[in-house]
């Protein structure tokens, strides 16, 4: 039973983590002739300082100007067969079907007419050219089944923001999950001969440009010519910054991201740790039975069995145990599928496809070979003479080596757990510069005329303390432009949020210098702007060149609007009272009950308006959900590996006390106390555990440091905390040894000696 539990746990986690790695390595390879797909990327760098800006954790920005895709197809018709313009940034509005708001899980993209042909996605119903109409919508097969059942989806209507009808004109085959362009439905990106939110060349760079070539080698030709092509349409230098365009195969984007590489390396370490700890534990348990099973091996050899027969017998035994473990593993995965899918952010049906099924099969084969070959070889080489005498070879070297690997693995995983627990706690409890308790928010583009009335009606409600509107959510990137220094050179990216005068009070922003806004174009700047501008004499009263006719009336404490994934941004709040996108409401207690009452009031009073309020705390949790999932993955892995190691350690101690029972009895006859016996066994374990624990903790420290590099704000990794973790692991090991050996240490030595 112990062997089955050990292998089942190791097999479960190993299969899931290694399959996740294979899944991510298959990103963007789900399309026909995926090697012919390319994506445009931008490289912004300062010609004087060499400073660069990127959105992939490195130096490249994959969001570019809307016309680039069409220009590629027009200027390079020989190489580029099709090119498509995609917007995922502003695609996800509030969509309703039969007056029910679609879940946030329903993903949407804004695409042009060439989207399906470029990617090779089959269109099952409808004409993709209908996407030229701005109110057109295509849905996936699964979306059509979920919402329309057996009815024909063509002509069905979804309502955007409860005011714009979006008509279903077609159905396409589901897009697999291993792509950045997964969409349950797509809407047209076209508008009045241009692109929604585009603003042409040099305008809004929020679009992906993906193209298909005739041959994979043509991507390099496009790369050689794209810069010259763009320079035909717009200047690529401005204020000392240079824009350079290049292209890469789409399939390499995800794999070459530094964040992806780090994540997969960590998954690999975790999977390797628990998988091999489980195998080592199985070997340890099997080898521990050597003394008891030697005689039966000798009997088999006396009856004509050779080494090969004995080896086959033990491989057969391992095969049966592995088969049972596979069944237990399948049972665990099937019954915990919801938890697993949440932790890995992928459906099991996508994780285990025909293309990736080789991963679990390879894991099972490796498990069988590694767990069976070594024990089988050891048992097959037991001399036939052992049938006549007791086999006393304890294989101590093997056992200690196996224990060393197990202790290293468990200390590594627990050390990594320490890092994830501390960082997640740091992210969720760190001061964001706003007061999130009781703060709720809703976003929707509304007619400016109705906003004052809605604001007043919300303010009058008994559950509401205060309300303010703004152009942007308090969390996320605002409208941006270059922040210039006194020498006219760019010193940062300015985030601009247009807000009501009482906005700072509502969201809990602290003004540390000056006064609140009271007039249009009054400006509040954050501490980061003061630092970058080097205003040592104060900022109040100064004009702000980036905002025409604006005057700074105060300085507020820094707000981490882009979370702690990003460095602190320079922010300016621009005062006014005519903003129609984001409603910020400060609720009275009890918050959860009053949030429910507020949303009920909105549905009843303003049924034509798509405003659903959510807590800012929930928005933060959503931002950090990947950290939360990773933390839980490490937590579960830690629990599994600790259980496996404890089972193996108990088996080892049990075997050692039985094998050395006569030695222990003789020591007691010669005056040794129980404490002396326990000290003997504990020291024997510590000889192995101390160096292995320290090795595992050191590995965890460096892997944890690599994982933390994705955050601009990192928890301090105090070495003393890692030493404390090592001490806890050592205490657990010693406790297991003492508890298991307590009986034999206190047993009457006569009971052990009389059997001789």
List where the protein language model places each region.
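Generic structural signal for small/hydrophobic residues in well-ordered secondary structure
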Residues: 24, 40-42, 72, 116, ...
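Intracellular coupling helices
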Residues: 2, 280-321, 381-392, 647-688, ...
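Hydrophobic alpha-helical transmembrane segments of multi-pass inner-membrane transport and secretion
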Residues: 1-24, 260-295, 323, 327, ...
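Short juxtamembrane loops and helix-capping segments at transmembrane helix boundaries
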Residues: 25-34, 48, 54, 184-194, ...
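Mid-to-C-terminal secondary-structure elements
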Residues: 111-125, 137-259, 456, 460-623
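Small-residue-rich transmembrane alpha-helices
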Residues: 15-19, 231-232, 318-381, 422, ...
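Membrane-proximal extracellular/periplasmic loop immediately following the first transmembrane helix
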Residues: 17-93, 198, 202-212, 216-225, ...
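Membrane-helix entry/capping segments
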Residues: 1, 31-32, 227-273, 291-292, ...
């Amino acid at each position: 039973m112990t062997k089955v539990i050990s292998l089942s746990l190791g097999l479960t986690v190993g299969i899931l983590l290694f399959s996740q790695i294979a899944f991510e390595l298959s990103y963007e390879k789900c399309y026909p002739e995926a090697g012919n797909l390319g994506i445009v990327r931008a490289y912004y760098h300062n010609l004087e300082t060499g400073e660069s800006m990127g959105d992939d954790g490195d130096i490249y920005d994959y969001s570019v100007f809307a016309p680039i895709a069409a220009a590629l197809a027009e200027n390079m018709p020989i190489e580029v067969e099709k090119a498509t313009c995609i917007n995922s940034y502003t695609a996800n509005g509030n969509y309703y079907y039969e007056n029910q708001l679609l879940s946030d899980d329903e993903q949407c993209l804004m695409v042009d007419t060439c989207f399906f042909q470029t990617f090779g996605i089959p269109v099952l119903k409808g004409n993709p050219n209908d996407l030229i109409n701005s109110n057109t919508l295509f849905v996936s097969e699964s979306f059509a089944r979920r919402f329309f059942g057996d009815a024909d989806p063509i002509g069905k209507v979804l309502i955007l923001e409860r005011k714009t009808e979006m008509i279903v004109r077609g159905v396409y085959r589901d897009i697999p999950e291993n792509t950045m362009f997964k969409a349950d439905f797509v809407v047209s990106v076209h508008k009045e001969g241009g692109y929604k939110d585009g603003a042409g060349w040099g305008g809004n760079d929020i679009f992906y440009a993906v193209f298909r070539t005739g041959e994979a080698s043509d991507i390099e030709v496009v790369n050689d010519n794209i810069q010259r092509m763009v320079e035909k349409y717009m200047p690529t230098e401005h204020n000392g910054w240079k824009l350079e365009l290049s292209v890469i195969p789409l399939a390499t984007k995800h794999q070459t991201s530094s964040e992806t590489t780090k994540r997969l390396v960590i998954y690999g370490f975790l999977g390797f740790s628990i998988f091999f700890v489980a195998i080592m534990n199985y070997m340890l348990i099997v080898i521990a039975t050597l003394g008891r099973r030697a005689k039966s091996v000798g009997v088999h050899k006396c009856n004509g069995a050779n080494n090969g027969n004995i080896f086959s017998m033990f491989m057969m035994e391992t095969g049966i145990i592995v088969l049972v473990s596979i069944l237990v593993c399948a049972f665990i995965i099937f019954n915990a599928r919801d938890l697993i899918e949440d932790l890995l952010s992928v459906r099991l049906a996508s994780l285990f496809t025909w293309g990736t099924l080789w991963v679990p099969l390879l894991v099972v084969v490796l498990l069988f070979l590694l767990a069976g070959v070594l024990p089988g070889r050891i048992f097959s080489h037991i001399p036939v003479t052992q049938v006549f005498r007791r086999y006393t070879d304890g294989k101590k070297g093997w056992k200690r080596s196996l224990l060393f690997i197990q202790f290293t693995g468990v200390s590594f995983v627990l050390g990594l757990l320490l890092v994830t627990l501390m960082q997640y706690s740091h992210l969720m409890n760190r001061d964001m510069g706003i007061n999130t308790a009781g703060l709720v928010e809703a976003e929707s583009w509304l007619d400016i005329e109705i906003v004052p009335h809605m604001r007043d009606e919300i303010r009058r409600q008994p559950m509401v303390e205060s309300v303010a509107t703004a152009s942007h959510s308090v969390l996320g990137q605002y409208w941006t432009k270059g922040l210039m220094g006194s020498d006219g050179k760019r010193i940062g990216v300015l985030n601009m949020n247009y807000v009501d005068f009482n906005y700072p009070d509502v969201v809990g922003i602290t003004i540390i210098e000056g006064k609140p806004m009271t007039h249009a174009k009054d400006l509040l700047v954050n501490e980061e702007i003061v630092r970058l501008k080097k205003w040592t004499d104060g900022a109040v009263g100064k004009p702000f060149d980036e905002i025409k006719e604006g005057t700074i009336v105060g300085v507020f404490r820094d707000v981490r609007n882009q979370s702690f994934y990003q460095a602190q941004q320079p922010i300016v709040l621009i005062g006014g009272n005519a903003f129609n996108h984001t409603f910020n409401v400060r609720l009275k207690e009890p918050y959860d009950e009053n949030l429910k009452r507020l949303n009920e009031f909105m549905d009843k009073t303003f049924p034509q308006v798509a405003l659903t309020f959510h807590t800012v705390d929930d928005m933060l949790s959503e931002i950090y959900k990947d950290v939360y999932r990773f933390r839980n993955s490490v937590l579960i892995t830690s629990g599994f590996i600790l259980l496996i190691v404890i089972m193996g350690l108990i088996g080892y101690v049990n075997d050692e006390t039985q094998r050395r029972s006569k030695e222990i009895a003789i020591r007691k006859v010669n005056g040794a106390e129980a404490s002396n016996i326990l000290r003997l066994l504990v020291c024997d374990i510590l000889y192995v555990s101390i160096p292995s624990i320290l090795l595992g903790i050191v590995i965890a420290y460096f892997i944890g440091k690599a994982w933390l590099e994705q955050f601009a704000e990192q928890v301090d990794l105090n070495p003393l905390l890692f030493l404390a973790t090592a001490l806890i692991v050592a205490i657990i090991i010693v406790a297991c040894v003492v508890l298991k050996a307590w009986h034999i240490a206190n047993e009457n030595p006569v009971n052990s000696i009389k059997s001789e």
